């Protein structure tokens, strides 16, 4: 065997592009959350054994997989098997999620409690711990913020209030992400998910769309699911 190749090892699928998978070795030891463009990290470009298709095994972002025929020079490998999943979120399709941060804005667009409840139900139904994040809290009074917190507390959920304008609550949400293995940001369009990701990882520079003045809601900009390391 070539010294540039090794036997089997495991890794986590961080992105899917056409018929290829990007797998990060030992990624299970890092912290991740999802977004929609490449960070150009050192990853292995992988194909998959046809037997997985015959067995009806579908691989999604977040899946832990076994690799073989690894070429470290060219950074390629073959996915030979899929490890058991601990959880699965259907939309976006992400496996092994341990925390879903559900972002809802208190203004621009106005908080929609019914919409928030649908995201919470999805998280609970997927056996994933939900974290409710209230964004743009600089646009409302402290009294209104406490009203929303009390309302969601009656539902059984504590809230984190976040404002990128005055940096309020940012460290708290970072601590939540670092305490778990794989986190997902979810929520309606226009609530500030992309802005939050750009703040946490400035090198990404993800495109941001403004809230429609006519429709009073955000414009959907997500293209695909990808995992990124939050770092230290």
Regions found by a protein language model. Give the residues of each.
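Canonical P-loop GTPase G-domain recognition
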Residues: 139-191
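N-terminal accessory targeting/assembly segments
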Residues: 1-113
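Conserved RecA-like P-loop NTPase ATPase core
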Residues: 13, 62, 177, 196, ...
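Walker A/P-loop
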Residues: 189, 194-195, 199
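Conserved C-terminal guanine-recognition region of P-loop GTPase G domains, centered on the G4
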Residues: 78, 88-160
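Switch I (effector-binding) loop of TRAFAC-class P-loop GTPase G-domains
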Residues: 51, 86, 203-232
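Conserved ATP-binding TGD loop and adjacent catalytic N/P-domain core of P-type ATPases
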Residues: 185, 198-202, 208
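Signal for well-folded cores of large energy- and translation-related assemblies
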Residues: 14, 121-124, 138, 150-153, ...
